[in-house]
Structure formats: C-alpha cells, structure tokens
Amino acid sequence: MANIIPITSFSVPELDVFARLTENQLVNRADPANAMFIAESPLVIGRALDGGCVPLSFLMETKHVEGKAAEILSRCPEDIPVYTAELDVLTQLTGFKLTRGMLCAMRRPALKSVAEICTNARRIAVLENVMNPTNIGAIFRSAAALGMDAVLLTAAGSDPLYRRASRVSMGTVFQVPWTYLPEDVSWQDTLHGLGFKTAAMALRDDTLPLSDPRLEKEPKLAVVLGTEGDGLANTTIEHCDYTVKIPMSHGVDSLNVAAASAVAFYQLGTLHNNV
C-alpha cells in the first residue's frame, strides 16, 4: 500500500522539491550524488522508471492514486511518500497546472562518458548551446523516432531532465543515450578519435545538400546543430568535416532548430539509411 500523505500545509519542507526549489537548485552540481529532477505525467515517469531512475516522492491529484497512478505506484517502494491534493490546490502550490495531475521527484542518474555512449553508435546528434527546453525535448523525440543512437550536448545548453524538456520529449530523454561534451578538450577531436565525421547544419553558400550521398555513406556521422537564432559558432563550422543545409523554398531561409533536427535525422539517421 502506498504511503499516501494528504497535503494540509504548503509549508511542509518535504514539498520544497516540488514548489520552492528551482530546477538549477535541484541539479545541485556541488553535490551530484544528491541531485534530483522532476518528471511530469505518468508516461514520462514510467519511461524514467524504465530507464532505471530512482523515485523519491510523488505529488499528485487525489483521484489519480487509484487511477492513472496505480500502475506507476505499483512499481515503487511501498514507503515512498505520495503527497496528494485536489488539482486547484496543486496548482496553487506549484504555480502551474500539472500534466495528467502527477509529478515525481527522482534521483538524477550518473552520466556516462562520451566514449561509453558513442562506441557502438553510428548516428549521433551534437547540440551546441541549444537553450530552450521545449526545443531540447522535441529534438530528443525526433532522435528517438528517426534513428539517432545518442545525443551529446554542450554544458551551456538546456538540461534534458528539466521538467518541460522531458515532458515535451514524451520521456524519450530516458530512452536515447545522452551526455555532456567535455569542456576542457576539443569535442571535434574527441569524436574524430571515435571514428566520427561531423556535419554542421549551417546557413552558408558553400554547403552540401542534406541528400548528398557522401553523408549517407559515412559509417559514423555526427549531425551538429546550433543555438536558436545565431546557430553554430563559426569556429565550430570550420572544424566540422561537412557543412550541410536543408534546401528550402518560398524565400524561407531557416527552420527552428527542432524542426531542422527532424528533417536531418530522417535523412541521415539509421531509420532511413542502412548504415
């Protein structure tokens, strides 16, 4: 039987993780062993559990305890705290309307190294300073659907485990292997050392079309996407093996990074190419 705790006061310290700590505070870089994240909705929480994430506590609508949450709770220790209230009370507490009426505080998993997640990969995505959590989530969803084996991110970009990012990804951030690129060495050199060629998605005249057969024939290819607005840094483009552009019409010169990723992943991912 789950440890159901009806909410009687907003000031209970155990609710800080849901109501008063920012996501940056939850990351807790000074104490990574105790770092946390918040997963939202039964689907996302279920995929986090599938990925081996450890649940710490729940916050949910009272009606979901024996409804949508029942299967999720059956997978968790019986003594895990489950804080409950009606939806309007939860909205007052958190400041937003819960998707499917459920949040779960979970322990952040330890990240693997670039070499560990890329050794057997053939198609990976590199995200340079992509800042919007919604874009991060959409990119992960496309990566999962369209045959990308891993995602690498620069440290300045948005965290894939932010609540909005994991929700928009439909939980695929727990299915697609990912990690951060090292800041003390050239990540291009790291990827070249692992056998990857790099393809920068950039708005330049001296580019290959996305359908160029040389890209599809590469046994190991990293698709490199840049930040919203400015795109990739010039130095990044110059150090990549290819520069690639999506052909467009009607005078449109660019796509949102999440939309561009879907097009690129479809064309170059393992789903489309027998590489």
Task: Give the location of each predicted region.
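Glycine- and other small-residue-rich loops at beta-strand/loop junctions that grip anionic moieties
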Residues: 7, 37, 128-129, 154-155, ...
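Short acidic-hydrophobic, aromatic-tinged amphipathic segments that line or gate anion-handling sites
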Residues: 4-9, 81-86, 176-186
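Active-site/ligand-binding-proximal alpha/beta "capping" segment
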Residues: 199-252
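Structured adenosyl-cofactor binding patch, chiefly the S-adenosyl-L-methionine
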Residues: 102-104, 142-146, 157-173, 234-275
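Boundary-proximal intrinsically disordered activation/regulatory segments immediately upstream
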Residues: 1-71, 157-158
